[in-house]
Amino acid sequence: MGSCSLQLPLINLADKTLEPGSSKWAEVRSDVRKALEDFGCFEASYDKVSLELQESIMKTMEELFALPVETKQRNVCPKPYVGYLNHNNLSESLGISNANILENVNEFTQQLWPDGDGNENISKTIQLFAEKLVEIDVMVRRMVMESFGIEKYIDDHLKSTEYRMRLMKYIAPPEGDANTTVDDYADLLAKLNIDGVEPNVGVKVNADISDDVNANPSVNAGVGANVNADTGVNDNLNVDAEANGDANIAVGGGVNANTDLGVGVNVNSNVAVNAKTGATSGDDVEANDDNEEKKLGLPCHTDKNLFTVLFQHEIEGLEVKTKDEKWIRVKPSPNTFIVIAGDSLCALMNGRIRAPYHRVRVTEKKRTRYTAAIFTCPKPDYVIEAPKELVDEKHPRLFRPFDYRDLFTFYHSEAGRKIQYTLQAYCAVSEA
């Protein structure tokens, strides 16, 4: 169960004296490094995202998700899994590439309103919000590289990345139980008479962090059926879900999910199955683990990208696992955002930064949950390699250089789906 007493480090990134080269910058830079070394993430206070803009992005998401399904389905992109996703009407999401650039957001709104000029107000709100999240990402990446003495690589590093924004909606859990279980969702779907879903069988629950889940819009859930999704949560069975493909439900199988352009979710096979979830983490989950796994909206995983900046607004759900195996329940606060390091950053920093396991539990009833996130991803063909300055006798090279896309080819291979630690299995230096 997530602890309310444990909290992530809170770091103020909006101090007026926070300028590169200043004493305040050095102080905050040290705090950021320590937080990422110890937790792999932190809560960033950033009041440059005004409350007015926060409310505007919330209203924008409400307006967008209120559109007819056929309208939202116009959100398509040549790159796979960047557009609209609908997971059994339990959750849905919209995706935009490099949303910090207004032209890209205009293309997105023109997809939804092709007969006009898009929607200027919505475009501007999304672009302004994405721009602020990108500011946080760039500041944190500068601080990280400076703190390790590799600031000479900053400009090239920033040019080697791109952003994926995803707007997400989750329906409120059924009334009567704030601690909603997977079975509750199955029962709800049965009552709604959604095609392909029967009570007390596999149910798809959408992800949140790095949770652009690559899934086909429909899920045929049922014992012996195929699941056209990535992250499946199955009653008493595990799901071996292959990225963007049909996966057979199988006892003891693993879940391997891909997210928007490689922001990955990896939930391994060969681990203990928690009663009535079938969704297990890379760590063994005992059936009596406080029954917490029953309440997951996203099983325990690490991100595969560089950084994620998440806006939870008022409804909590994110939980982060500490080094000593305790869970921190992250409670949203005004003007705060969660910054999470991914496996790619861990490799780039030669293991000096940890990529934390985290999960999402959907527990608050009666309120629809909206979240927005920016995912920082390496551009195609970018090779991730720790700089020589981070390799010495005390810190031997931990990972071989690798192409980001090649990592995901392995990640979704038959062998990759059976492995607990994808990054280590794919590119760890054997002598390390």
UniProtKB/Swiss-Prot annotation:
Domain (Fe2OG dioxygenase): residue spans on this chain: 281-378
The EC number(s) this enzyme carries: 1.14.11.-
Cofactors (names): Fe(2+)
Domain of life: Eukaryota
Gene3D superfamilies documented for this protein: B-lactam Antibiotic, Isopenicillin N Synthase, Chain
InterPro entries the record matches: DIOX_N, IPNS-like_FE2OG_OXY, IPNS-like_sf, Iron_ascorbate_oxido_reductase, Oxoglu/Fe-dep_dioxygenase_dom
One example of a Gene Ontology biological process annotation: glucosinolate biosynthetic process
Binding-site residues, Fe cation: 301, 303, 358
Signal peptide: none
GO molecular function, one term: 2-oxoglutarate-dependent dioxygenase activity
Presence of keyword Iron: yes
Residues at which 2-oxoglutarate binds: 369
The entry's keywords: Dioxygenase, Iron, Metal-binding, Oxidoreductase
Binding note for cofactor: Binds 1 Fe(2+) ion per subunit.
Its biological purpose: 2-oxoglutarate-dependent dioxygenase involved in glucosinolates biosynthesis. Catalyzes the conversion of methylsulfinylalkyl glucosinolates to alkenyl glucosinolates.
Entry's family note: Belongs to the iron/ascorbate-dependent oxidoreductase family.
Cited PANTHER family: 2-OXOGLUTARATE (2OG) AND FE(II)-DEPENDENT OXYGENASE SUPERFAMILY PROTEIN-RELATED
Name under which the protein is recorded: 2-oxoglutarate-dependent dioxygenase AOP2
Originating organism: Arabidopsis thaliana (Mouse-ear cress)
Lineage: Eukaryota, Viridiplantae, Streptophyta, Embryophyta, Tracheophyta
